C-alpha cells in the first residue's frame, strides 16, 4: 500500500498533507505555497489552469474561471439560488442538475469535474513531493454536508483518479490534529468557519480516543458571504456617487470581489482598509475610479446578520450534547474566516472563554485528514475515531410524515431497523421514500431516493411486516433495505446517485480525465519550461548588469546573443528552443562565472569549480 494523503478540499483554498516519520506534514505545492486556491480556469486557447495561476487571471477571464464550486457540489439548482448570484460564470439548469458553462471550450462541466481538477493538482503535487504516485486519499467535507454532497465529493475523487478511502468531517479532522498528543481528557468545541461552509462539533478528546458528541452547522455560510456584503456595499456606494450599476459588468464584479476579500483580510489586523480600483468603469465623459475607505466598525455592521447566524449552531450543538458552555474545556477555531475579530468575540462571549488559537486555521483540517490517512494506512496506531451522522435519516409514512430511523448525532458506522406495515388491504407493494433532515413533514426534508418492494403477500392492512434497515458506513453514506418478513423478499438502495450524476456519467468523466491526463501533464510541463526559461532570462540580465565591469566584451556579446534567442523562443512558445537555449545560456553563464571568480582557473594548479557549483551560485559583485 502506497502513501495515503489527507486532503482538505475547501471552498476557497485546499491543502494536502501526509504522515512522515509518524508526524503529519503539509505538502508545499508546485508554486511553493502551502495552500492552493480552489480555482480552475480555461484560457481562450483552451489551456487548463488550476490554483494560483487560475486565480491570477480571473479578472480578465471571469466567464471561464470557476471558484467556490464546493457550494454547488451535490446540489440541485433550486437549492443554490443565492450562491448563483455571487459568481460571474454562468450556471445552467439541466433536469435540475447543476452544470457550469465554459464558453472557451464550448462545453459544460459538472461541479464534480471542476473539483476533480483541484484534487488532481493536489495529488500531482503530493506525487512530486513523495517521489511515488499518489492514488489514495482521505478527503474532508463539512460536518453538515448531506448524503448527496458526500457522495458527490467521492465522485470528484474518482474522476481525479483517486481511491477515496474515507470521507471525514472537517471539525473531526481538526480535532485529530489538535488532540493527537493529548493524554488528558478534554471536551472541545471546534468552530469551523471556512470560505463557504460553517460547522460546529463538540468532541471528547483524550488518550487516542476522539468521540463526537454533537455536530451542527450551516452549509450556506462562509467567508464568501462576508466578501459579498462588502461587494454589495461598494456597488451601492458607486451607484449613488456615479449613477453606474457595476453588477452589469462581470470584469468589474470580479475586481470588486478580489478587492472585498483583500479588505476583509486587512480588517482582521487593521481598523481601516482603503479600497482603490482605478478605471472600474468608463463613460463618454471619461474613466471612473472607485476609492472608498472601509472601517472595521462598518464591516461588522454590514456583516452583523452573518455573525448572528453563527450563534444558533453553537447553541444547537451544546443542546444536543446536553452540555453547558462551562463544560467546554477548549474552543478551537478552524477556517480562515475565524480570523475576523467579531467572530472571535462572538465565540468568546457565548462560551465564556478565549478561543484556543494554537492550531493553524488554514492547515489543521488537512493535517487531521493526514492523521486519519495514517490510521487507514497502518502508520498511526492507538487512534479511535467515533464520528456521527449530522442529520436525521428516515422514511415517508402515511400522511406525508417523516418517520426518523437514525436520529442526528448517531455514532457511525451504524445499522438500525424499524418495522412498518401496509396502508390498504391486499397492498401488493410499498414504495420506500428515503429522507434526510429534521423537519416533521416529508416535503420539507431532502429526498435522497425512492425504491419499491414488490410481491407482498395479500393481507389486511396493518398485517404485513415490512422491516426497513438503514446502514450508514464510516463515510456517512447510506444504504437502505426493505424486507417482507413473511416472504423474505427484499429490495435495497445505496444512495449513490445522490450526487445528481448517473453512474455512467461519472465513468465517462473518469475516462475523459484519464484521456486528457497526458495532454494536461504535457501542457503543465510546457508552462513549467516556459516559466523557468523566463526566470533564467531575468536572472541572466540581472547578473550581466552586476558583472558588467568585470566582463570581456566578447563574453558579454556571446551571452547576449543566446539570451536574445531564448527570449524570442519564450515569445513564440518554442518548447524545444527554450530547452536547448536554456542549457546553452546556463553553460555560457557558467563559463563567465569561472572567468570572473577564478581568473587563473586554466593556469597550472588552478581548480575550476564544478558544474553543479556554478549553477547553484548566485553571481553578485563583491563590495
From Swiss-Prot:
Keyword flag Lyase: no
Pfam families named among the record's database cross-references: HSP70
Name of the molecule in the record: Chaperone protein dnaK
Signal peptide residue numbers: none
Function, in words: Acts as a chaperone.
Keyword Nucleotide-binding: yes
Gene of this entry: dnaK
Location(s) in or outside the cell: Plastid, Chloroplast
